[in-house]
Amino acid sequence: RGYIGVGSLGTRSEIAAELILGGGTPEQKAEWLPQIASGAVLPTAVFTEPNTGSDLGSLRTRAVREGDVWKVSGNKTWITHPVRADLMTLLVRTDPNQPGYRGLSMLLAPKPRGTDAEPFPAEGMSGGEIEVLGYRGMKEYEIRFEDFEVKAENLLGGVEGQGFKQLMQT
């Protein structure tokens, strides 16, 4: 017998670690992998969007580079455990002129942990829980980003347009 809630926590850490291990810069690996492995940082995967399901080629959440930050705007859905997560692996479209999977990039987006009363205390983030049947150990959320800032250095691998490829390597 297993407990899906425990498994879902491990899956989030595995996805983030695999992304960073396979596609991260040496600096990103040094910063994040030890913290994920020790449990000091709890990551979550932020990929799925409303009305697109798992069709990542239709992804619309945008990240625009402004100086030393990416400003993220858009909506995500069915995100598991985002409230208490410290780090989001956030798939965004950085080049709207590229069709389909091209132009997608992965950001390593730190955020403060939320609470039941204030799930998303970070500026530029809001959202709400999706009520589900059955999964008592997992909480699913919708998230809205409005100019949510991520440091430019947190572009996974330091190269735009590699997000889908990086994700498929996990």
Give residue ranges: language-model regions.
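A short, Trp-centered hydrophobic/proline-enriched beta-strand micro-motif
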Residues: 39-47, 91
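Short Gly/Pro-enriched turn/cap motifs at secondary-structure boundaries
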Residues: 51-54, 78-81, 96-98, 131-139
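Short acidic, glycine/serine/threonine-rich loops at helix termini
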Residues: 20-21, 55-59, 82-85, 100-102, ...
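Glycine-rich beta->alpha junctions and the first turn(s) of the following alpha-helix
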Residues: 122-170
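A short core secondary-structure module
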Residues: 73-123
